[in-house]
Amino acid sequence: MCSDEVRMFAFTELLERCPYPSMKTASIGLFKNQINGAFNSKKDRPPSVFASPVIVDKFFPILFRTSKKWCTEEDTFWDDYSYQMQALNLYLFLLICDKSENRTTVFDQEKQVWMNNEYIHHLEVTIDTIMERHKKDSNDSDEQQSGIRLMNLEMMKNVIEQIKQRMTLSV
């Protein structure tokens, strides 16, 4: 088994430089597994970097990005949808598993303000814009596809609502 630092480097490379979107998406799940392992490890071991502020400080700016193209070029949003859902689920997971100790600083006020202002707010605006467009175009010949997309947007909104309920901010 390699050290935490080596694994952190590998995740940084995967999330920042990997040219394959599906691999980036899958790496979020692997990253979450590492975090889960760190939180479940015995207390007598040295603390893992996977249960430390490094998660929020180094990886949040890498993981939680939005695109201005999403509202105007909807296909770009759908290309990123799986990644964004994985990222949102990772954030929700951190809010759940780090609630008692705040080892990652995920509950620090400035971190939550950043998350809301830089990511969640933009994602909500995008979701609302796309939903409105699909509701208007629901009579299209692509009605089934539109319905599936509306359902996916509702699922994303649901995860965001769960996140907001767990955040200590009043957003």
How should each PLM-predicted stretch be described?
Residues 4-107:
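Long alpha-helical HEAT/HEAT-like repeat alpha-solenoid scaffolds in very large eukaryotic proteins
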Residues 121-171:
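Eukaryote-biased recognition of C-terminal alpha-helical segments
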Residues 34, 84-86, 109-112, 144-145, ...:
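Residue-identity detector for glutamine
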